[in-house]
Amino acid sequence: ADGIVAVELDTYRGSFXK
């Protein structure tokens, strides 16, 4: 969630997806 779409998605997937 640093502002970059890739990072946002990675953080989101890392929290819920994992």
From Swiss-Prot:
Q: Which is a GO BP term held by this UniProt record?
A: proteolysis
Source domain of life: Eukaryota
Q: Which residues form a coiled coil?
A: none
Keyword Ligase listed: no
Keywords, A to Z, come to:
Allergen, Glycoprotein, Hydrolase, Protease, Serine protease
EC top class named in words: hydrolase
Question: Which modifications occur after translation, per UniProt?
Answer: Glycosylated.
InterPro entries, A to Z: Lectin_legB_Mn/Ca_BS
| GO terms for MF | serine-type peptidase activity
EC numbers on record: 3.4.21.-
The role this protein plays is: Has a serine protease activity.
Question: What name appears for this protein in its UniProt entry?
Answer: Major allergen Epi p 1
Species of the source: Epicoccum nigrum
Taxonomic lineage: Eukaryota, Fungi, Dikarya, Ascomycota, Pezizomycotina
